[in-house]
Amino acid sequence: EERTTEAQTHEDGSLVKRQNAVSVSDDVKIKTYSGTSLIEIGNRIMEPYGNAYKNMKNYADALNRLKAEMPNTKAYCLMAPTAIEFYAPSKYNTGVSKSQYEGMCYIYEQLKDITPVNAYAEMAAHTDEYLYFRSDHHWTTLGAYYAYRTFAKVAGFTPVDKNTLQTGKLSPSLGLFYTDTKSTALSND
């Protein structure tokens, strides 16, 4: 299946549209561990995603209430797309809208006096890089860097060049999903 993943942004970082495609595998295993469904595709395990608009509205309302308590503070909101948005067939996302992109846009539209930081386009542009741990739901430091770079642009400062940063690797790095599944496909994350 081809998934549309890359997005264009306006100068302020707001999303214009999704437009690029990434090939994803249909070789999928779905299992439940500790009451949570997990989707295994190749050497990656991910949680399914579903837009629950009531929950998204509650989240945006909570941010708006917090901002109202701090009227003189500049506030930002960065919603993080998860690996399943880019690396799984869309049929494994659930809800009214199966798109995290649409869910993020919905939340951003609800915000009052809070600047959205839409890192989606930046993440989508780098899906061929190691942005997400294969055995956990978190970003790698590289994925976090790209989100930071988007934040810097929106906040009006120059980000540190990633080539000036020291990198390293903790081995072995086995995340939450490996703990749940003991999948040998994840043993080298």
Show the residue positions of the predicted features:
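Extracellular glycan-modifying ectodomains
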Residues: 1-189
